[in-house]
């Protein structure tokens, strides 16, 4: 398994390299935009006072990064070839087909949970074996979209942007159009603590 961060830091010669994996950028379209508090919170994750109105300046840019998670990616190409495999990694000399996706995901999730160590996590100061045993694994899988990772706001497009932001998993499944040739299907393995919060992992591969 890779991680969002390992793909972002990969060899630029590999097709899977993507410096902006899991990133979201929101910017205004050269003019100030007035946003209600609820929409502001949906777009940025920042709490606003109930009933507040916020003016987003003409030069506003908000960048956010999805927590680092384990991922497994493959091509949906119905006629896979070695050439497709080598675009991902030049060292690949073979490829295989996944014939039962549900079984593949279930077994991979089982193996991942069995291999987790305290050292796999970013914030290890508060991590204990008891804490480790209380983690749950959420698996989200679907095809990647290729409509980019930037929302450009004007007064007319605010609601459209809010609707897009309500899908918290949109960003780890969003890619730039340049990657569309791969027809990527992605499996995201999200670890959550006892409070349901996503726990970021280190970029190391599994």
PLM feature segments, named:
Residues 1-206:
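NAD-dependent ADP-ribosyltransferases
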């Amino acid at each position: 398994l890779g991680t969002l961060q390992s793909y972002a830091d990969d060899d630029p010669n590999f097709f899977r390299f993507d410096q902006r994996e899991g990133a979201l950028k929101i910017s205004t379209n050269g003019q100030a935009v007035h946003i209600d508090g609820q929409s502001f919170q949906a777009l940025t994750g920042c709490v606003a006072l109930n009933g507040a109105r916020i003016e987003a300046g003409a030069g506003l840019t908000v960048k956010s990064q999805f927590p680092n998670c384990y991922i497994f990616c493959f091509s949906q190409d119905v006629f896979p070839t070695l050439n497709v495999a080598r675009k991902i990694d030049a060292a690949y000399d073979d490829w295989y087909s996944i014939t039962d996706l549900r079984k593949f995901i279930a077994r991979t999730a089982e193996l991942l949970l069995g291999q987790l160590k305290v050292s796999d996590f970013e914030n290890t100061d508060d991590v204990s074996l008891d804490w480790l045993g209380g983690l749950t694994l959420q698996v989200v899988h679907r095809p990647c979209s290729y409509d980019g990772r930037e929302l450009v706001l004007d007064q007319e497009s605010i609601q459209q942007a809010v609707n897009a932001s309500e899908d918290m998993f949109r960003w780890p499944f969003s890619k730039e159009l340049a990657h569309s040739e791969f027809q990527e299907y992605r499996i995201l393995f999200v670890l959550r603590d006892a409070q349901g919060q996503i726990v970021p992992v280190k970029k190391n591969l599994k």
